[in-house]
Amino acid sequence: MPPSSGQLLGDEEREPTSTPAIPEEGVYKVKYSNRRTNIVRLLPNGFQERKLRRLADLSAKLFNEVNYERRQQFFHEGKVDIKGTYKKYYEKYKEKLRTNAQAVLNKNNEAWSSFFSLLNLKKEGKLPQHIKHVSPPGYCKDRKTKKRKLILIVRQDRYKVDAENNKLILKDFNMEIEFVGRLRWYGKQGRLEIIFDETRNAWYAHIPVEVGVEETGKKSKHVVKGERKSIQIAKPKGNKVASIDLGINVIASVVVSDGTWLLYKGIRTKEDYFYFHKRIAEVQSLADRTRNIGEYEAYLELLREERRLFKKLKRRLLHLYRNLASHLIKTLHELGVSTIYLGNPFNIVQEKGDNFMTDKWPYRKLMHAIELKAQEYGMKVYEVDEYNTTKYCAYHDVKVKRNPRGVVICPKGHKLHSDLNGALNILKKAVGVVVNEVKKPLSFIVDHNRVAPIKGV
């Protein structure tokens, strides 16, 4: 059935978003979503594998074609005919992709809608601090090899997840594909994306759900029967507040309004980051040499190795961040915290330094992990711009001098741990409160299999 219009539909998982609470103070309340994504690995047989490749390539081709025409319209006319291009490419691809062509076009619609929203924010001077450039939607292809990425997009009502038999049923393509993995979330399913991971030579299904939702006026037939029907698992035990300063050597410095001070050391994150970037640099150098001498097959293989190392680094960092977030939020829950003021270190990533200091990705992912875990415990989270929070004394509002050992010296005659000063300033900026008596820090090291206390600190 053809679409009635080029409408903008939203079936994807949404990360927490920030809306101004006190705009002039740089404090933004995080808005939670009830959307989560189950990710499982598919185990297609030989016939299914070949069919998936054809369909995924066709799906990506549709995305790129409509995106190319819309980009040309934008660059030449300054506007985009969403409805006209939607109808044109739906008619072109509906025979092979069926109604799933709508899902591909809707995904591109959403990308353009997001782009125009950011353009408007930029014109109004309200662009989020971590966004420096606004560009039209890009293509579904690898930047270096220029090959299309394999991604099959399926409309939310054109597939079924058989949780009992571990099978993913694609109605329009007559396929029942076995899968392995945990279906953590229970709820109404959204738009499915099946993605081929070239670095692992494996297919993964990304199944978004509205957690706990089974009805929208009437009971939906399209429900993923996962383990959890609710995101929130507990309520706050008290009304205390906490502030979090994110950093490099100390990943998180946390101050609670009762004077509790928590420190999470970043030894493992830096080890992983620099180890993998060294290996990646070696592979990049070798890839450049093979390209220069015309060894194209070897060059492509080295590009795959480079991507594999990047993805492995990201997986390891995400695992560390989730371990930290889980331990931190559980600790704050036991301490009776109900509100968190989370520093947004946009100023750090703008300063010159090594890649670890200037890379925005780790900070955004760490913030995301903390916010998602806080949602499970019913805590409110506000993001606070960290601008100048480490340069001024939290107690006297005067500029401090920082020595190499991580201590700031106030002209008024006292010293503070720089990460403590940052956390105190975040709390002060957010609610106008300064914790006068801070307890001895509880220090932890974040590892891949646990978060362990550091004795004697």
From Swiss-Prot:
Pfam families on file: Cas12f1-like_TNB (PF07282), OrfB_IS605 (PF01385)
Superkingdom to which the source organism belongs: Viruses
Residues covered by region (Disordered): 1-22
GO biological process, any: DNA recombination
An example Gene Ontology molecular-function term: DNA binding
Keywords of the record: DNA recombination, DNA-binding, Transposition
Family label: In the N-terminal section; belongs to the transposase 2 family. In the C-terminal section; belongs to the transposase 35 family.
Protein name from the UniProt record: TnpB-like protein ORF457
